Amino acid sequence: MDGADGTDLANGTDGRGGGLRAHIGSFTSGGGRGITSAAVDPATGALTLLSATDAVADPSYLTLDRDTGVLYAVSETEQGAAAAFRPTPEGLTALGPAVRVGGSGPTHLGVAGRRLLTANYTSGSVSSLPLAADGSFSGPASVLAHEGSGPDESRQERPHAHQVLPDPSGRWVLSVDLGTDSVRVCAPDPATGALRLHGETVLRAGTGPRHLAFHPGGEVVYVLHELEPQLTVCRWNAGSGQLEPIDEVPVASAAVSGAVRAYPSAVVPSPDGRFVWAAVRGADAIATLSLADGAERPRLVGSVDCGGSWPRDLAVDPSGRRLYAANERSGDVTWFDVDPLTGQPRRAGSVAVPAATCVVFV
């Protein structure tokens, strides 16, 4: 296992210097190295591995606070924890020990002001942790428990919060619950930062919503479902905190859906708002949806192989020209050049990262 101080992976290259970095989460329980740091070639998008840290177990999801430059990771374990890191040219430096989040099996996290939010899948709750000015943890978590269940007795026997993130306005926090087929809208308490339920949007029963993304315009939300290969398109009103479903769009063709059991995992829009991509496990594919002529409802226009097995997450590089897939079961990160006219990804390369789960650019 690589050392907590950042084991060198670059065959004698120390990784010093500027430029874009990618940080890759993984399941240490599945053979992963923890968080792997890589340099990104600006011309080709190729990743060169620099170092890895196993300072936290099962860092399956990462997020960057762009105000402080601090990188946060969940520890997707029964105890449930989060950790904070300061990126360096060589890799990552931990900002103190990991802290408990007050829930079990956190799968996602986001930053809202001076609070870190986590979605706790196993316990079906969302947590809010206070942060100091330097991005370190400054107090215990407050926890908001979800309630309810769904028709799938094997996956929806109780709440399973899978994602939590602030809306673009910063006024609201949205949490996606696979177990209750719903998206909850919360408002942080002005005095304590604790989350208070504002409203709940119930989606089609049994579809298991997993992950959502905002269109760059901020008024449309795409909710990806895990238990059916569908994307729900919603209108978002930041003034009232209301989420309104308006359409469902497939992310896999009927032929693909009939041949394999598809488990969609992640959805990301292009920075220019013209395309939406969805990772589909089982089919091991990346679906491309087009928003031609400014339409708010995308349509499926194609699908490509993800370059590995079980794509758990997708990330678009800051230029918007490349797409990266974290393929958990094949243990690699594959990158694609994006056709600017069609949005279709074309495989350009890959690098081995055991049990890869997430990619974040710094």
Regions found by a protein language model. Name each.
Residues G19-L20, D67-G69, R114, S169-R171, ...:
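Short coil/turn segments that connect the beta-strands within blades of beta-propeller domains
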Residues I24-S29, A73-T77, T118-Y121, D167-P168, ...:
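Conserved beta-strand positions in repeat-built beta-propeller and related beta-rich domains
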Residues G31, D58-S60, G105, H160, ...:
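Beta-rich catalytic cores
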Residues A38-G45, F85-G91, L129-S138, C186-A194, ...:
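Short loop/turn segments immediately following beta-strands, especially the blade-tip
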Residues L92-Q163:
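Asp-box/WD-like beta-propeller blade repeats and closely related beta-sheet repeat scaffolds
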Residues R100, A141-Q156, I246-A259, G302-D305, ...:
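Surface-exposed loop and turn segments in beta-propeller and other repeat-based domains
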Residues V260-A325:
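Loop/turn-rich, solvent-exposed surfaces of beta-rich toroidal or solenoidal domains
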